[in-house]
């Protein structure tokens, strides 16, 4: 014990001597009432201005007395700035957080001893009428360049899942597909404990992980396994959202079971199991429902009629995963199984008006039913030998069977009704997909001032699709009176093969200043298609017909065999910048990036269709060049400015350059164009600036411009006498697009209980289409200019169990055409509403409600210019200490919901209505349970 005291004293003496050149801060932490030392406490240093974390954890050392007992708990740290105001933050389980303000002046020399120890008070919850007094937690803070959300600071109703927690996090948005953005930047992957989950299927985790199991959610740029294995920055870091569980849920298992039933024959059942050992994670999810619903009453997402489900979907699914990771993360193995069975009913109405002579109008109504079964198997393996090599494989096998039927009624008008058509269809098919990737990354011997790396990758893909279709057409022409009935039957087969080896060589300066690589990736692909068309006298699939040769339509039956030899050659160079050591630890960040990719294509198409039997070849060189620059305001990684300039070419299908004619579908003719150019091209410039230095204020500004020297559009001609539309691809040049926007997040008030989030953007699109006007033989380029302005946001107040949010969103579109007889169009969509949630303190009963007015103006159909007030509400009650939750939900109580899409281009305007999920009430019963392993096991 004496020896330890001597070492401690010498250590303190050395630190004190070094303080003559730079100040050191000495402090103590203790129980505020008993004055006893608390060496287990965690002490952090924050900037007083915005609570940014400067030092996450300072070691707290025990100071022993002569009798061997602990007399004090001391900490020492060196301030990073000469003049600054800091906030010392101490935490310990069972105690309220303690804070102490510390002001440092550049004139301070030597050691500084805090006048008062950091005193922590034990948490004592006490009832004051209906109020419970507890410590207040900070919702979000920065730890280095990592944005950390403290899940314990969010007050959500019992039974809430991870998705509801994420929707409440400031600066975070999430759409119905589970795609998450933080301060306008899209998250690459949602992880659990810094590991991928269900092969990136975020919705499983979002909808099934109880929020009460979460401790922190961290958002940061994650280093890749390759960078870790090679000890160099060879790949760009990924922007991830990492869900960290509380310690008590990191072992054992977590399980949920939910059952629900409602009006309109709505029902739902699901179960979830998540189990952990030291190195292995097991996950199992089962779901059966006909709800197809992702709305959350009182949530932060601005849901609109356009984002409503556009079909009635019934789904049965089972997903399972076994994930192993060694303690040093050098061996990783993942096995994944996924089965989905679905039934999809869709109803759609469409109004399509063309901007050609006579303004022909097409009205259609369609009903369809599709069934699908999908089985997916996947296995990933990775082995890392640090500073030596990395090897990984990925195997995926998918099988799908599907069938369906459809009915469509369409009517064409030119001043009056000219044609009526009824279509009935059937289809049945199956497909296989197999993918195998293998990557080998050995590390080469270093050069004098450079590190060099080399790796080889292999990609192998195979796809097969077998499909049969049958259609019946009934056409009633009122201009040239006729009544025609016909039948089509298709036998379709497609096989695709793809092989791609890749060789990569790169060098990296040892001072982390320069990095460059060259990459060669030759590939071969083969796409074989057989599509035979028959004309029977009844509605049957080809497998049910006899004497197929006698009813074959040779002009619309074809065999296609496309072979593509491609070589991709990429050169990349970057110049790094090192941010100051005292702020960000000397991390390298890209300053300038240059990339040039050349793609050499040789295509060989053997195409036979009726009397057309041709062998077409094409040689194409494609260019993809880009320069990206990155700057940081005041060398701060949380305030970057990104600028990108580039030019990109992409190939067009070789089939478009074949002079074929396809009139298999009545009233529709499709033609090829031998004069079509073999590629599209785009020039672009983009700028983006974000500032996330403060937990109170974030902002984002972006702008972009793109110009298309070469594009492909579909020309269309309409014959009002026969009712036939003819489509042909044509090149156009000169379309462009400009956009700019800004996003601001501001938090204020006591305990930051107020949040304002606003997103503004506008864009201008100059759209060109090559249109053949009625009565003319040559194409004419038609232009439409569309200017769109959008602004949306919310203001929220949250304190304890109360959450109130007011939202507003408006989008205005103005379109002007350069062709004759174009009527200027103005369309406005706007909505505004109020949502609220309150939890009774004692009963923990939660009431949620949301009311929104959705309005539309300027649509061509008067039936779409409406005001719809949508009201939703729910009530939930926990039992058994929150393990059992009952919830009643009511959607669209006033029966106002609809789903409408609106589109304008140079050819016309299209308004589409989908049958959305009907209004309904639904009762849920949810049970959560977990079990931890016994101590000592």
Q: Which residues does each PLM region occupy?
A:
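Short, acidic, small-residue-rich periplasmic hinge/interaction motif at the N-terminus
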Residues: 30, 44-46, 89-93, 111-155, ...
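Short, acidic Ser/Thr/Gly-rich low-complexity loop/linker segments typical of extracellular
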Residues: 50-74
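A short, solvent-exposed loop/turn motif at the edges and junctions
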Residues: 51-53, 75-76, 83-101
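Structured interaction patches on ligand/partner-binding surfaces of diverse proteins
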Residues: 95-114
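Extracytoplasmic beta-strand/coil segments of soluble accessory domains associated
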Residues: 163-198, 216, 226-235
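Short acidic/polar hinge/loop motifs at secondary-structure boundaries
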Residues: 195-223, 278, 282
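Primarily recognizes Gram-negative and organellar outer-membrane beta-barrels
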Residues: 200-203, 223-265, 280-937
């Amino acid at each position: 014990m004496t020896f330890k005291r001597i070492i401690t004293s010498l250590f303190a003496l050395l630190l004190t001597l070094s303080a003559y050149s730079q100040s050191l801060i000495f402090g103590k932490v203790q129980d505020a009432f008993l004055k006893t030392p608390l060496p287990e406490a965690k002490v952090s240093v924050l900037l007083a201005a915005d609570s940014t974390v400067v030092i996450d954890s300072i070691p707290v050392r025990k100071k022993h007395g002569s009798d061997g007992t602990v007399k004090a708990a001391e900490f020492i740290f060196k301030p990073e700035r000469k003049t600054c105001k800091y906030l010392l933050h101490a935490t310990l389980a069972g105690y309220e957080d303690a804070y102490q303000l510390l002001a440092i002046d550049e004139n301070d020399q030597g050691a500084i001893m805090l006048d008062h120890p950091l005193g922590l008070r034990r948490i004592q919850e006490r009832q004051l009428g209906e109020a419970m007094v507890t410590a207040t937690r900070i919702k979000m803070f920065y730890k280095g360049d990592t944005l950390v959300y403290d899940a314990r600071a969010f007050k959500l109703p019992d039974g809430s899942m991870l998705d509801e927690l994420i929707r409440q996090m400031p600066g975070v948005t999430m759409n119905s597909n589970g795609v998450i953005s933080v301060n306008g930047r899209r998250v690459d992957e949602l992880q659990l404990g810094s590991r991928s989950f269900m092969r990136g299927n975020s919705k499983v985790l979002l909808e099934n992980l109880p929020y009460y199991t979460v401790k922190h959610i961290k958002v940061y740029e994650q280093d890749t396994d390759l960078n870790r294995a090679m000890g160099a920055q060879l790949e760009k870091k990924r922007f991830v959202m990492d869900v960290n569980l509380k310690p008590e849920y990191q072992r054992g298992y977590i399980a949920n079971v939910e059952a629900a039933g409602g009006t309109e024959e709505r029902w739902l059942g699901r179960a979830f199991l998540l189990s952990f050992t030291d190195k292995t994670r097991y996950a199992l999810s089962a779901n059966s429902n006909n709800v197809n619903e992702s709305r959350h009453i009182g949530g932060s997402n601005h849901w609109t009629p356009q984002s409503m489900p556009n079909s009635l979907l019934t789904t049965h699914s089972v997903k399972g995963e076994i994930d192993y990771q060694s303690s040093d993360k050098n061996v990783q193995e993942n096995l994944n199984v996924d089965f989905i069975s679905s039934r999809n009913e869709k109803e759609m109405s469409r109004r399509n008006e063309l901007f050609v002579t006579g303004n022909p109008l097409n009205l259609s109504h369609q009903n369809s039913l599709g069934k699908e079964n999908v089985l997916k198997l996947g296995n990933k393996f990775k082995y890392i030998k640090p500073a030596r090599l990395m090897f990984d494989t990925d195997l995926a096998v998918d099988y799908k069977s599907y069938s369906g039927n459809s009915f469509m009624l369409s009517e064409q008008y030119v001043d009056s009704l000219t044609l009526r058509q009824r279509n009935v269809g059937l289809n049945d098919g199956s497909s296989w997909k197999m993918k195998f990737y293998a990557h080998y990354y050995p590390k080469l011997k270093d050069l004098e001032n450079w590190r060099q790396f080399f790796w080889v990758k292999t990609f192998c893909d195979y796809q097969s699709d077998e499909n049969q279709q049958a259609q019946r057409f009934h056409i009633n022409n009122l201009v040239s009176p006729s009544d025609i009935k016909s039948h089509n039957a298709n036998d379709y087969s497609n096989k695709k093969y793809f092989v791609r080896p890749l060789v990569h060589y790169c060098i990296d300066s040892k001072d982390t200043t320069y990095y460059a690589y060259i990459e060669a990736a030759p590939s071969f692909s083969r796409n074989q298609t057989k599509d035979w068309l028959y004309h029977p006298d009844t509605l049957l699939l080809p497998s049910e017909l006899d004497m197929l040769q006698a009813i074959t339509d040779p002009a619309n039956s074809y065999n296609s065999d496309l072979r593509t030899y491609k070589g991709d050659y990429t050169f990349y160079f970057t110049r790094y910048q090192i941010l100051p050591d005292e702020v960000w630890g000397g991390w390298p960040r890209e300053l300038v990036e240059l990339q040039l990719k050349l793609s050499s294509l040789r295509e060989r198409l053997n195409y036979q269709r009726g009397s057309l039997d041709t062998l077409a070849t094409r040689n194409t060189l494609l260019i993809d060049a880009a320069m990206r620059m990155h700057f940081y305001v005041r060398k701060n990684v949380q305030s970057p400015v990104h600028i990108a300039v580039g030019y990109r070419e992409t190939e067009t299908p070789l089939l478009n350059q074949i002079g074929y004619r396809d009139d298999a579908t009545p009233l529709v003719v499709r033609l090829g164009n031998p004069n079509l150019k073999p590629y599209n091209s785009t020039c672009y410039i983009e700028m983006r600036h974000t500032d996330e230095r403060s937990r109170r204020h974030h902002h984002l500004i972006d702008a972009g411009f793109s110009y298309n020297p070469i594009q492909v559009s579909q020309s269309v001609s309409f014959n009002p006498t026969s009712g036939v539309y003819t489509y042909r691809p044509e090149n156009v040049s000169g379309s462009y697009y400009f956009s700019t926007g800004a996003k601001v997040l501001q938090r204020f008030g006591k305990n930051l209980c107020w949040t304002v989030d606003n997103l503004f953007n506008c864009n201008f699109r100059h759209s060109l289409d090559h249109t053949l006007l009625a009565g003319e033989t040559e194409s004419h380029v038609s232009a439409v200019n569309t200017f769109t302005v959008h602004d949306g946001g919310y203001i929220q107040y949250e304190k304890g169990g109360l959450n109130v949010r007011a939202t507003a969103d408006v989008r205005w579109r103005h379109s002007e055409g350069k062709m004759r007889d174009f009527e200027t169009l103005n369309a406005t969509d706007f909505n505004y509403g109020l949502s609220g949630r309150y939890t009774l303190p004692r009963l923990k009963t939660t009431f949620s409600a949301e009311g929104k007015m959705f309005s539309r103006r300027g649509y061509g159909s008067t039936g779409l210019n409406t005001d719809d007030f949508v009201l939703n509400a729910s009530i939930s009650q926990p039992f058994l200490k929150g393990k059992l939750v009952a919830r009643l939900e009511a959607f669209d109580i006033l029966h106002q919901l609809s789903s409408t899409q609106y589109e304008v281009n140079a050819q016309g305007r299209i308004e589409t209505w989908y049958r959305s999920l009907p209004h309904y009430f639904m009762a849920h019963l949810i049970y959560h349970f977990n079990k931890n392993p016994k101590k000592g096991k």
